[in-house]
């Protein structure tokens, strides 16, 4: 009888320990979330950043997911709320993030020429009679985003320098990204 009880107890012990030496398959892997602003087509942007995310994830030993926000502020709010761990953002968004979300800049990019600079562009149809910024007076304009330096702040300053009052001389709206 003792042998039978010992055998049953041994089987129960063995079966209760099965899987204890293995890592749990339900354990969640740590994921680092990278937020980016909508500077081009969202799917293309994620595809373009996939090699970077994979290389970074391999180096850190964790998965890196790329998140494209619907607006510039979306990345800042994501960092502030903790739903985004870090972001690749343009200069003005970085300044806003530092002020609004108590973040800090870890890396700062540099132009390929190595020289400081920034630019904004204004596009019109080829067959348009608009030849200068002053010709935009009375027109409808699409800016990128209120938090975009090149897509609103600098472009708006260029228009003001050309004698255009943004509130009186034009109608404008925000497209939501450089790709729109």
Question: What annotation goes with each model-predicted range?
Answer:
Residues 1-4:
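Positively charged n-region of N-terminal signal peptides that target proteins for export
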Residues 16-19:
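C-terminal motif of bacterial Sec signal peptides marking the signal peptidase cleavage site
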Residues 21-23:
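Bacterial signal peptide processing site
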Residues 29, 34-59, 69, 92, ...:
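Bilobed "Venus flytrap"/periplasmic-binding protein-like clamshell domains
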Residues 63-73:
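Early extracytoplasmic/lumenal segment of secretory-pathway proteins
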Residues 73-87, 100-101, 134, 177-180:
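Short helices/loops that flank or line small-molecule/ion binding pockets
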Residues 87-94:
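Ligand-binding clamshell of periplasmic/extracellular solute-binding protein-like
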Residues 97-110:
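Ligand-binding "clamshell"
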